[in-house]
Amino acid sequence: MPDRTTTFTGIHFENPFLLSSAPPTESESNILRAFEAGWGGVVTKTIGLHPVVNVVGAKAKFMRTSCEDAYVSMKKRPGAALHSSWNWELISDKTLDWWVPRIRRIKEAFPDRVLIASIMAGSGNDKELRNWQTLAEACQDAGADGLELNFSCPHMDRKDMGSNIGKDEGLCSVVTEAVKDAARVPVWTKLTPATHDIVVEAAACFRGGADAIVSSNTFPALPPIDPETLEFEINVDGLVSSGGLGGPAILPMSLCNMARMCQAFPDKSFSGIGGISDFAQALSYVLLGCGTVQVCTAAMLDQAVGPNVIKRLLAGFDLFLEHHALDGWTSLEDFRGIRRDRVVPQSAVRRPAGDDYQGGYEIVEGYAAPDRPAAAKV
């Protein structure tokens, strides 16, 4: 029997597949349904000290496209396939006091499953850092197995919250360190892809004591404009703000960010998110070095918590291990990270003639082209 279990940041998981912090994890009932369906872990909707008020109307929409009609739109069209999701939903609109007893009840119902509490506060002063600690202490005391720090929500108005933290290496380090000072459970930091160099922010989080990096959250994006009405396809009174793009469209970009971080920190722990709907996509993250993966968009489209998605993931995982049994692979750790080193600088990829390619520029003193790796064995 294939071994689905894994240990990630010291936490035992029945399987490496988690529902990410998002609308599917905004309620006790949804989280209980997710565990009943078979998910190895769930990350709660992000919890704050002060409840937010979301915009009126739809908080999320799905965009589709097709070969016959290739434009990307939120409009439902026959034969169109999923392209991406778009949302402008903020963090949980429930209080910390609302969440604490629910975390406790969920862990009592499923003690063998992993519940990670996603939390967020500001970062502008010492009081805000204490708010992070208050959230951390309350959630871990209620039974949360770990904490995920939301440094990545792309549409928080405050300049000291969400992705505005994730773009600032100093804040990444300071906030992580403050939470680690109060935490008795593992601390993960969830980073934004909307930064100049995600490796810099990852390094800052690790300096602050992070046990793992989660990447990535949604990419900042606007909804399409309807060519007939000239209005944004989702709006309130004609107005729109930047939201977050997720789903299949972000898979290649999220993999690129993950590859860079896994190469920079091969001995650290990473949880991959972005564009996962079956085991093939999850496998890509694991081969780069991820110890767990998280799912959102695909689950939202599958009864909110993805019962069929987790079945596909588990079946694909089992089949993959059975297929590679002769290679001696019995668990995720046997193949985690084995394609990490295949990602190289462009100049290191073989050219049809000669070995002296220098990147297309005149050789200057002090410049050294990257070493070309040996041909990869399949």
Located regions from the model:
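Short alpha-helical segments and helix-capping/turn motifs at coil-helix boundaries
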Residues: 3-4, 24-32, 99-102, 130-134
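Conserved N-terminal beta1-alpha1 strand-loop-helix module at the mouth
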Residues: 12-44, 48-56, 60-71, 78-81, ...
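Active-site mouth loops of central-metabolism enzymes
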Residues: 13-27, 87-92, 116-132, 188-196, ...
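Alpha/beta enzyme core
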Residues: 32-37, 41, 124-271, 280-295, ...
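C-terminal extensions of enzymes
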Residues: 286-287, 293-378
